[in-house]
Regions:
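Arginine residue identity/basic-tract feature
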Residues: 9, 21, 81, 103-105, ...
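Short, conserved secondary-structure transition motifs
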Residues: 190-217
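Long, contiguous, compositionally biased segments that the model treats as domain-scale units
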Residues: 1-183
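Ampiphathic alpha-helical segments that act as solvent-exposed interaction surfaces
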Residues: 164-192, 226-242
Length: 382
């Protein structure tokens, strides 16, 4: 729980934050004026201070998604290290999932074997340019510590993605965090890939922290073996550039990700429907003429794409037309209310079709990004 107060007009309104929901409270008429001015207001910024250790206050900035009455629902917020400290120019993302994607463990072993001491000086493993919201950015994947803070150094840190900011606003920080969260989603084929910590820097010096719902103190990953042979500089730049086309809540230009699930939703009717929607979205991007042809229904679209990637069915006893017909039939039974959650949980054939659809959607995504079929065959799809 975070406590503090926001500035409004010439006064201060106390608050508490829990689960990114800010509750304002006071007997002063100032709260009434605030609610009158901000009731049902969307996407605005408020400033304030948070209570730190003892009597120390820290400057805070809040991006409000919307507010109802005296409750503000937050997209994210920034807490500066000191009350007068408000300048930052770089955001640093720590993610165990992106550590795996950028091959932290394997790069670490290579650097240590080469005689590099990462406890003394950090090293940049990769530098990747990308564009977001019509602005150019540079991503640096850095490993190690700079030792400037002594015992205050973050010794749990492994790798860190550092992105210099262009307009230095909280919205830019939020957009960047969403883009790299989506990168982790696509690479791991999983919907829950939280950041462990997001730090704000001024010339390599930590000056504050960024908080959003995409974070978790319990974030952990063990998927590094998936990316053992990944050629990072061959695949990640193109994928990142595509994902960064959409930094908002709607995906209209980049690859779809809404069909990805977690452990609980992996095999469910709802996710199956979302997979079909993702497939149709990509098919329209790849072959708009056939997608708009009424004589080319879903079953034919599926068969066409499975024939484009025959390696997906090498270990299956079914042909592309049989698989496509089964997928079409399952979607029909869901639409008519004949399929239920427990049907999916206990049907190994349906589960296999869901796994096949995941692989097909990832292949189609890579094809749309601009990779050749030969390159796609070398991409680690699990």
């Amino acid at each position: 729980m975070v406590k503090g107060f926001i500035f409004f007009r010439d006064g201060e309104i106390p608050f508490v934050i829990e689960d990114y929901r800010m509750e304002l409270f006071t007997d002063d008429s100032l709260l009434k004026d605030f609610t009158k001015e901000h009731n049902f207001k969307k996407n605005y910024i408020i400033q304030g201070q948070c209570f730190g250790i003892g009597s120390q206050c820290q400057k805070a900035t809040f991006l409000v998604e919307h507010s109802i009455g005296n409750t503000c629902y937050l997209c994210c917020y920034i807490i500066n290290r000191l009350v007068e400290e408000d300048e930052y120019n770089t955001i640093g993302l720590q993610s165990p999932f992106l550590d795996d994607v950028f091959r932290y463990r394997y790069n670490y072993l290579d650097m240590v074997r080469a005689g590099t001491n990462l406890a003394v000086e950090p090293k940049n493993a990769y530098k990747i340019p990308f564009a977001m919201n019509d602005r150019q950015h540079d991503l640096v994947f850095r490993m190690g510590h700079n030792n400037r803070l002594g015992l205050l150094e973050d010794f749990d840190k492994k790798g860190e993605l550092l992105i210099p900011l262009q307009i230095v606003e909280i919205q830019e920080c939020y957009d960047i965090s969403k883009v790299f969260y989506r990168l982790a989603m696509f690479m791991t084929s999983h919907s829950e890939v939280p950041f462990k910590r997001i730090t704000l820097y001024k010339d390599d010096r930590s000056v504050g922290w960024f908080y959003c719902p995409l974070m978790s103190n319990e974030a952990a990953s063990a998927s590094d073996v998936m990316f053992y042979e990944l050629d990072v500089m061959r695949f990640i730049p193109k994928i990142l550039r595509n994902i960064a086309l959409d930094s908002g809540n709607k995906i209209t230009k980049s690859i779809p990700l809404g069909h990805l699930g977690n452990f609980d939703s992996m095999f469910s009717p709802q996710r199956f429907v979302e997979q079909v929607m993702a497939f149709e979205y990509l098919f329209d991007k790849l072959d708009q003429k056939r997608a708009q042809d009424k004589r080319f229904p879903l079953r034919k679209e599926l068969e066409y794409m499975f024939d484009e990637f025959p390696q997906l069915l090498l270990q299956s006893k079914l042909s592309s037309d049989k698989v496509s017909d089964q997928i079409k039939e399952i979607r029909r039974t869901i639409a008519h209310g004949h399929s239920y959650y427990y049907d999916f949980k206990n049907d190994s054939n349906t589960q296999q079709l869901i796994i096949l659809l995941d692989k097909l959607i990832k292949n189609m995504s890579l094809l749309w990004i601009g990779f050749s079929k030969e390159e796609i065959a070398e991409f680690p799809i699990h």
